[in-house]
Curated annotation (Swiss-Prot):
It catalyses: 3'-dephospho-CoA + ATP = 2'-(5''-triphospho-alpha-D-ribosyl)-3'-dephospho-CoA + adenine. GO terms for molecular function: ATP binding; triphosphoribosyl-dephospho-CoA synthase activity. The keyword Nucleotide-binding applies. The gene is mdcB. Disulfide bonds: none annotated. Keywords: ATP-binding, Nucleotide-binding, Transferase. Involved in the formation of 2-(5''-phosphoribosyl)-3'-dephosphocoenzyme-A, the prosthetic group of the acyl-carrier protein of the malonate decarboxylase. Its EC number is 2.4.2.52. It comes from Klebsiella pneumoniae. InterPro entries: CitG, TriPribosyl-deP-CoA_syn. It is an enzyme of class 2 (transferase). This is 2-(5''-triphosphoribosyl)-3'-dephosphocoenzyme-A synthase. The keyword Transmembrane does not apply. Belongs to the CitG/MdcB family.
Amino acid sequence: MKNLSPLHAESRVSWLAHTASACLIDEARLSPKPGLVDSRGNGAHQDLNLALMERSARSLQPTFHALAEQSWRRPADIALRETVGRLGREGEAQMMLATGGVNTHRGAIWALGLLVSAVAMLGGEGQSQAIADAAAALARLPDGFAPKSFSKGLRASRRWQVPGAREEAQCGFPHITRLALPQLQHSRARGASEPQAQLDALMAIMTSLSDTCVLSRAGMAGLQAMQQGACEVLAAGGCASFAGRAALARLDAIMLALNASPGGAADLLAATLFLDRVAG
């Protein structure tokens, strides 16, 4: 998208922000997701529900707008990295206000925030791999103003010595570009409905993601159960098939029994939906 007028650039910025927020809502509503909040209920959560997730997603639209606006046609450098970090932390504070202190989308702010910024850096358009590469370049830069605190995800990543959300972004979101997007397109091509194709994309992520949300609650055995169950869904034909849906129901029961929710995979699914909609 070359030499957009200021009016058209602002229109694109607004569209990116709306799309990012809409993808969070679409991910939350998608059903049936194993262990996750969806249109059926709260999954393995006591403090989350669909209305709260939707309120959180809408509260983040101004943050996504600011990220796109501040990143428009800028190179990946320390100044932009620190701006993106500051806006992300401000967005997290707004999320907490909207939810009464419940962490609904901290991981999604990181993943989607980087991808929104990356699209804007490229002038509002780009192929999915180019967008992911731009996000990775930004994620690899240090943010000198980031607080020296440890999230649950970071603690789990270090305890179990597995890559977390930071490494996923710094590597260019391989679970999106190599697994989720190809699976989404493959399932659509085979005649799956859009919700079924999106569930298959979630399964593709879950087959190999070291989801620190699951690790925090259920340890390595729980993570392996999640990965194996997701593999079985896809091996059975995916969610468009009766056998695949039966395997998905079994995986849902396993996650609920473990009291574990693959929140990291859900964040990456929302980011997958965003890339699918904005990439040229």
